[in-house]
Amino acid sequence: MMLNLLQYPVIKTPKATRLLENNQYSFDIDKKLTKPQIKKLVEEYFNIKVLAINTHRPPRKIKRSGSAPRSKRVIITVSANINLLG
């Protein structure tokens, strides 16, 4: 099932906390997912309309050279009256 590819919400960083005020939510996801797949997954799971998706791969830690990041971080923008986490 594709739901296993959506790992967890990111709310522990200061930037992610600021983004919540703008109706943007951060998630760590499987690094192989594309933007259309992410949009379909989020819209079906949360039953909402996604306005925009931004993705990036966080830099890996210096201590662990030789290994690629295991996840991709995605920022999902939704309508003003929707709350995904509450």
From Swiss-Prot:
GO biological process: translation
Disulfide bonds: none
Protein species of origin: Prototheca wickerhamii
Gene Ontology molecular function terms on file: rRNA binding; structural constituent of ribosome
Pfam family, one: Ribosomal_L23
Main location: plastid
InterPro entries for this protein: Nucleotide-bd_a/b_plait_sf, Ribosomal_uL23-like, Ribosomal_uL23/eL15/eS24_sf
Main function: Binds to 23S rRNA.
SUPFAM superfamilies assigned: Ribosomal proteins S24e, L23 and L15e
Family: Belongs to the universal ribosomal protein uL23 family.
Superkingdom assignment: Eukaryota
Gene3D superfamilies membership: 3.30.70.330
Keywords: Plastid, Ribonucleoprotein, Ribosomal protein, RNA-binding, rRNA-binding
Subunit (UniProt): Part of the 50S ribosomal subunit.
GO cellular component annotations of the record: plastid; ribonucleoprotein complex; ribosome
Protein name as annotated: Large ribosomal subunit protein uL23c
Subcellular locations according to the entry: Plastid
